[in-house]
Regions:
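Short beta-strand elements that form the blades of beta-propeller/WD-repeat-like
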Residues: 1-8, 34-45, 70-81
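Surface-exposed loop/turn elements that mediate protein-protein interactions on large endomembrane-trafficking
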Residues: 10-27, 49-64, 87-101
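Short, exposed beta-strand-loop hairpins at the edges of beta-sheets
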Residues: 77-80, 84-91
Length: 101
């Protein structure tokens, strides 16, 4: 199942699949939704970024000291730390780093 959208309503996040059908509902106390791709989504709770799969199952907790969240795409997300943009996968493995423009 691919994620097409995630909507926040009354203490819950509704996860919709590629056909626009509600696939899963999870409580919003998991954290503040930062973004999603078709494969996973990321929330911030306290001093951690938590990644979740399309079924709402936690993949990994990653400390926020890696940088400030910028964007998410496919199975990767980007954070900005100082003058660098670092790319991580959903499991918290750093893939690449480059100077931000």
């Amino acid at each position: 199942m691919a994620i097409s959208s995630i909507e926040h309503r009354s203490g819950w996040y509704d996860i919709f699949d590629a056909r626009g059908k509600k696939a899963k509902t999870i409580p919003d106390y998991i954290g503040e939704l930062l973004g999603w791709s078709d494969r996973f989504f990321i929330v911030m709770k306290g001093s951690y970024y938590d990644t979740y799969d399309e079924q709402g199952k936690k993949i990994k907790s990653i400390p926020t000291f890696i940088g400030n969240f910028v964007s998410i795409c496919a199975d990767q997300f980007i954070v900005r730390k100082g003058s660098y943009l670092d790319t991580y996968d959903a499991w918290g493995k750093k893939i690449s780093s480059r100077v931000a423009k």
